[in-house]
């Protein structure tokens, strides 16, 4: 523990937050992470509107975050790849990264739990997994996540409680493994799971609090376009994998 009573191990883990058109929830998220004990927080502006610039300025000036920026919106997949490359080149001594959403859905204590799991199991992909049976989960989120989870399980033979979680922890070795993964937007995270399965990388789940603010209205997941992208990943996997055929 540090002198302030915060876990000293958190200084070895970088938190990465991709953000598009943020509001004050980004500031609240960063402040809570600072209070939890994280010292290195990296925020990427993925081509946000000009009027959100003051939020990013405050994240840097008031919270001491490092800022990266895409001049145009490239999507979450590209944001993650940009961050992985930056971290690998800039922080070669770090233990790894925990990715966090900018909309306030991930509690600092759960981010810390994923960081601890990352340090304890550096060869594993760490997933912070929500419980969709809890009350307060929007119906569309409950249905969509259950369906995606079942399709993923059928195709890959791998049970993952929360395939779409943005709270993930990975070591430098895993960042390097995931850099070539295809996908520019939310489908990239699904491809990460498939890549982990292909490489026989362990996936460890950390139960986290299920938080939906204003029924998830601030999410940038497009129910139509991003769902098509995610299920296109499944279609490609179906065509290329003999494991599925063997189970039919």
Language model segments and positions:
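Conserved short acidic donor-positioning loop in nucleotide-sugar-dependent glycosyltransferases
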Residues: 21, 46-50, 74, 83
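Acidic helix N-cap motif at the loop->helix transition within catalytic regions
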Residues: 25-28, 50-59
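Short beta-strand-to-loop acidic/aromatic patch adjacent to the donor-nucleotide binding site
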Residues: 91-105
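Short, well-formed alpha-helical segments that are part of the catalytic scaffolds
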Residues: 21-35
């Amino acid at each position: 523990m540090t002198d302030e009573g915060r876990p000293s191990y958190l200084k070895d883990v970088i938190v990465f937050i991709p953000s598009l058109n943020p509001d004050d929830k980004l500031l609240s998220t960063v402040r809570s992470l600072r209070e939890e004990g994280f010292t290195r927080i990296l925020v990427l502006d993925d081509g946000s509107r000009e009027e959100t610039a003051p939020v990013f300025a405050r994240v840097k000036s008031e919270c001491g975050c490092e800022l990266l920026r895409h001049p145009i919106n490239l999507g979450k997949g590209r944001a993650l790849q940009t961050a992985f490359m930056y971290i690998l080149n800039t922080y070669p001594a770090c233990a790894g990264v925990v990715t966090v959403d900018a909309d306030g859905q991930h509690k600092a204590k759960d981010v810390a739990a994923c960081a601890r799991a990352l340090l304890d199991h550096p060869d594993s992909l760490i997933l912070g997994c929500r419980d969709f049976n809890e009350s307060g989960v929007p119906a569309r989120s409950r249905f969509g996540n259950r369906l995606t989870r079942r399709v993923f399980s059928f195709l890959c033979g791998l049970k993952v409680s929360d395939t779409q979680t943005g709270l993930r922890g990975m070591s430098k070795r895993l960042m390097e493994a995931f850099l070539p993964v295809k996908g520019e937007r939310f489908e990239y995270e699904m491809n990460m799971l498939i890549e982990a399965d292909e490489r026989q990388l362990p996936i460890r789940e950390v139960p986290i609090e299920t938080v939906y603010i204003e029924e998830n209205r601030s999410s940038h997941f497009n129910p139509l376009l991003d769902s098509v992208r995610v299920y296109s990943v499944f279609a490609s996997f179906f065509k290329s994998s003999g494991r599925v055929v063997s189970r039919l």
